[in-house]
Amino acid sequence: MQKNRLTGSMTLKYDITDWLYVQGAVQRDGYNLEFKQIQPTGAAADPQGWMTEYSRSFSEMNLNYLIGFNKEWGDWSVGATLGGNRQRTINKMFYTTDGGRPFIVDGLWSVNNLSDKRSKKDYSEYRVNSIYATADFGWKNQVFLNLTGRNDWFSTLNPDSNSYFYPSVTLSWVFSDTFRDNMPDW
């Protein structure tokens, strides 16, 4: 079996002001996998012998872009982002087997030497386009409210209903900071 994988990413960020920035990123992940299985002729389990070859190629590319800001006013902090993502994934697979028939020439282990070659080829590609936003509010670095929203559009779904929205709300309180003066000294 042989597997070759290539993964990489690059991010660029530009600060427009001390509180406003833009950022872009590109990420790629991909691999190629190949393997061959051979049962030679004359083996007790399968005297006719058999052979299988398999190869798969996978690639995923992501492009991310956003604009964001972080600002503080007295006891308050505010941060927000607005961005998007484009994802493209490609899968290719090729499979060849002997169909349970013997080799033409004994000892020649090649798919071209199969008396009954059966192959399967598969290809799939899909895309996901997304937009998202976040808003973060803080008070005295103790109470935090986080709002998020994301919408994805999937190429593999019916165009009339291929959109999904994911909202979230989080509220947290660091009570130990609020009651710091009244906490025991353990």
Question: PLM ranges: what are they?
Answer:
Residues M1, K36-M51, K92-S119:
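Surface-exposed loop/turn segments flanking beta-strands in extracellular/periplasmic regions
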Residues G79-N85:
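Extended hydrophobic secondary-structure segments that form protein cores and membrane-embedded regions
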Residues T178-W186:
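Outer-membrane beta-barrel translocator/channel fold
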Residues N4-W73, S77, Y126-D177:
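Surface-exposed extracellular loop regions of Gram-negative outer-membrane beta-barrel proteins
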Residues N91, D177-T178:
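A generic secondary-structure boundary signal that marks alpha-helix termini
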Residues P40, D98, S163, P184-D185:
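Sparse recognition of residues in long alpha-helices and their boundaries
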Residues Q87-T89:
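Conserved "boundary/linchpin" sites in short secondary-structure elements
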